[in-house]
Structures are given as structure tokens and as C-alpha cells.
Amino acid sequence: EMLDFLSACLRYGVSICVAGATSSGKTTVAGWLLSTIPERKRIFTIEDGSRELQLIRERDGRVTNSVVHTQTRDSENERQRIDQIALLDIALRFNPDIICVGEMRGPEANAAQEAARVGIAVLTTIHSNSSEGTYRRMVSLCKRAVDTPDDTLMGYVTEAYPIVVYCR
């Protein structure tokens, strides 16, 4: 019942952050949630380095859903480097129903919460030691991008992600 509730929230545009320690099942939960999204919804995924989410659905050799998978690319040449912030900017141009940021680890947390606060459903994962500490962790990551008071950022991230799921 809980997973069905979370799936319904995401389908209807509610952003969700899946938190937990390393190997706690965050990506598995996020992948399952995305697999329940109707084929007519446009999904844009952003993954750092390697692709873990497999969301393309096929029927009779034809793709039946609308998914854009993207990955970051590191490079010593700054012009060839593609980070999560750049991919979030690109995602917004695609008019997606859902953006999935594979894992927030740095200043991209600020760009992700901004996207979530303008009406795009954002599904993301984050490393956190507790459910209570998840929003504080988001604030600390956002501060890597902006010099905004903690209480203001706390208001932003709680508005952006009304649901936090903690995996043990």
C-alpha cells in the first residue's frame, strides 16, 4: 500500500526524495517508482557516470514510452564536461512530466529543488544518516551552489520535496 501511494504521488506530480545509507535500496525504490509511470508521461533521467535505471518499454520491437536517459561526462576539458546541473538545465527544455536525478551529491541539489518548486515532479536519491537529517543534508548540498540562509533553503527543500522516503 505504501509503494502504491508513492507511485500515485509521483504520477500526480508530487516530488519525492529517497534517502538512506549506501546500498540501502534507494535506486531500487526509485527505479520501481519510475516503472509504474504511465507510458504517456515524459520522463527525463540524469545519472552520474553510469546508467542504473532501465526504463525503456518495448512492444513488438517499438518503444512505447517517452524516456530520455542522460549521463554526466567528466573531462579535463571544461567545454567537454557535462555535469548534473547542465543536464538539469537541458531537462527543463524538454518539458518533462518527471525528472529523475539519480543521486544528489553536490550543488545540483539546488537546481533540482528549483525544478521541483516550479511544478515539475522530481524524483531523486540522497545519502543521509536518518530521515530527520535528510532535509538538513539537502540544505548543506544546496549551499554549495548558493549563499542563502539555512532557514530559507530549508523552506525551499521542504516545499520542493514534500515526501522523503528513508531506506534502511
Kindly give the residue locations of the regions a language model identified.
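Switch/coupling sub-region of P-loop NTPases
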Residues: L3, G13-A19, S35-T158
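P-loop (Walker A) phosphate-binding loop of NTP-binding proteins
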Residues: C9, A21
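Conserved NTP phosphate-binding and transfer environment spanning the P-loop NTPase/kinase superfamily
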Residues: V157-T158, P162-R168
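N-terminal pre-Walker A segment at the start of P-loop NTPase domains
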Residues: E1-S7
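Hydrophobic positions on the alpha1 helix immediately C-terminal to the Walker A/P-loop
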Residues: V29, L33
